[in-house]
Swiss-Prot record:
Family that this chain belongs to: Belongs to the PNP synthase family.
SUPFAM superfamilies: Pyridoxine 5'-phosphate synthase
Enzyme nomenclature, EC number: 2.6.99.2
Source domain of life: Bacteria
Pfam families associated with the record: PdxJ
Biological process (GO), any one: pyridoxine biosynthetic process
Binding of 3-amino-2-oxopropyl phosphate, residues: N12, R23, G200, G221, F222
Full protein name: Pyridoxine 5'-phosphate synthase
CDD domains in the cross-refs: PNPsynthase
Length: 255
């Protein structure tokens, strides 16, 4: 069995910005939410500057970089304009994601095979700038192997299909998607990639995936912010950290 890596929680604050933008003005402030999340135990903050600026804005990203004390993970489409903004912002990491204007949220993993010629120079520029690049991809062996060939140090496995199947009670599909994640995490680690997970995770699925020894980080936003409406952000994050700890403890018990 692989030795379990330390497990980090990245909190995504996009949905705070969505709520702010629904009415306009400055409140609620995603930077304030990020600071509160760090106070509550987040190891880092994730924010997605979409091309249509539907939630996070350029000024938010600049403030996050300037004001938070933990690493900033800058989610972005792989476009020349976004690359320039990210290089100017100098976050700890960037996560390259697919992006379509008509989607409500990121619907699938990045096709790194089909776009390798575009991605390669971007990844090289980030590596040269000391910015870690993560590729948000499905747990597909060919995509994982291409990520390694592109010299991206990190992948984030898209957990959405698995989480959706779990929520829908589709046990057969959930098990199939879970086995893809398990195999993908093992393969990724074997080819030298750091493995993260994200999209659609809640307390239960976060606990389950935390038992995979290859997973080093989970990036979670929507569930945390939704639960925060009822229990507060601090308690929502505390419960998530507890769920992740239970998953790691289950792993240690079987080691």
């Amino acid at each position: 069995m692989s030795k379990a890596l330390p497990l980090r929680l990245g909190v995504n604050v996009d949905h705070v910005a969505t709520l702010r933008n629904a009415r306009g003005g400055k409140h609620p402030d995603p930077v304030r939410a990020a600071l509160a999340a760090i106070e509550a135990g987040a190891d880092g903050i994730t924010a997605h500057l979409r091309e249509d600026r539907r939630h996070i804005r350029d000024a938010d990203m600049a403030r996050l970089k300037a004001e938070i004390s933990k690493p900033l993970n800058f989610e972005m489409a792989a476009t020349p304009d976004m690359v320039q903004i990210a290089l100017a912002t100098k976050p700890h990491a960037v996560c390259l994601v697919p992006e379509r204007r008509e989607e409500v949220t990121t619907e699938g993993g990045l096709d790194v095979i089909g776009h390798h010629n575009t991605l390669a120079p971007f990844i090289a520029r980030f590596n040269d700038a000391g910015i870690r690049t993560s590729l948000f991809i499905a747990a597909d062996p060919a995509q994982i192997e291409m990520a390694a060939e592109l010299h991206a140090p990190v992948i984030e496995i898209h957990t959405g299909a698995w989480c959706d199947a779990v929520e829908a009670g589709n046990a057969v599909k959930a098990e199939a998607e879970w086995q893809r994640i398990v195999a993908g995490a093992k393969l990724a680690q074997s080819v030298g990639l750091e493995v993260h997970g994200g999209h659609g995770l809640d307390y239960a699925t976060a606990q389950t995936i935390s038992a995979l020894p290859q997973i080093a980080e989970l990036n979670i936003g929507f569930h945390l912010m939704g639960e925060a409406l009822f229990v507060g952000l601090t308690e929502s994050i505390r419960r998530m950290r507890a769920a992740m700890a239970r998953g790691r403890q289950a792993l240690e018990a079987t080691a």
